[in-house]
Amino acid sequence: MTQSSIGRIWFCQIQRLLALIVLIGLSQGLSQPAFARGGAAQVDAELVFAVDISYSMDQAEQVLQRNGYAEALVSEQFLQALKGGLYGKIAITYLQWASYRDQDVILPWTLIDGPESAAAAAAKLRRAPYRRAQRTSVSGAIDSAMYLFENNGYDGLRRIIDVSGDGPNNDGRPVEAARDAAVAAGVTINGLPLVGIRPYLGYADIAELDLYYQDCVIGGDGAFMIAIHDRKAFVDATRTKLVQEIAAPRIRPQPSDILPAQALSPKTNCMIGELMWNRRWRN
């Protein structure tokens, strides 16, 4: 046997060995349990409830928001949608926000996998104390929510930020910049703007907050908003939103599949809140 023949035999054997290694690796990868990102538990969605507590939100509106989320979590419609998910569970956290420096979490990341865990989370929300704070930074809320996703112990098919509030951004960086950064990372931002709940407009309020949320706040794969015009509608709107989010397609969107901003050019001045604030205080 010549030296060249021996070389060809060794080359073929090495090829077979490499192919076997690849097949073993693929089979092991396919048989891994439902954990990812360093052991994070897989869920259908990771949701941040980002709720406005600025002074434009009076006590009644704050109670309305909080109870809306609590009641939606224990509703039959939500629990049925939860069971229909690929994993039958989601992870939630509740973030309160005002200025870009003022955010706090009153419900840390919590696994919701059925009626008992949903009821326990709802009870914690209802027990948490209320507070109010200065300014309205929607961008700060989005940025803080993005931080909360990191190393939270969960790996959701979707990551969603639910922004609820009654006014435009007037503090922190421009809201479009925060939204676009979140969308570019594959996160969906949905909205629950409170529009015309009070019979008057304050100096930091705008009449068409729903259009502002549509053009400047929400974004990402399947993003939507539900404008709330009546206090009595908050529970129904929150429940509808949660059901729609859980029932959404269960494949995590890739950043390359998502437009970094709204598909159409904004019709609303997304700096309106900052302009109104500066005009009010002449700075």
Predicted regions and their residues:
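VWA/integrin I-like adhesion module and closely mimicked acidic/polar interface patches used
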Residues: 82, 167-215
